[in-house]
Amino acid sequence: MVKFNPPVIELESIGELQFQQEILTFEDISGSGFEPGKIIRYRLAFVYDGLCISPLTDVSWDHTVTGSDTQNIIVTVNINITMLHLVSRRITAVRLYAAEILEGTEQELFRLVKEIELDIHGFSLDPNSGLYTARVFDDGTRYASSIS
């Protein structure tokens, strides 16, 4: 009888996913969400089995709102889904959280911006990069974040 031992995934694998700066990219668009010069810090969390939510990532992605008028932010989440499943096949979604920053410190608790299912409805394949991408609209809404 041949015993199958699945590959062992070290916890550093999760860190490798988190430290890639291109996981989140940003675009400012006209809107009423954020004043020019505001710094918004984003973090991710993973959803396991559709129920359990991991702690927020240690790594964060900061974005400074540009322009002379108020702006909303489109955050593009770029993920190699295959790599996520190497970490854990139980990951079913990714959650994007945000907080405003002043002098390097979060001025509020992180708010849920959106939960994105790891399926064809949440992510689409970018043939140029080979990564799965999802675009998330952030207008700074608090206490009423959309999960759909």
Q: Where on the chain are the PLM-derived regions?
A:
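Disordered, low-complexity "stalk" and linker segments at domain junctions of extracellular
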Residues: M1-S148
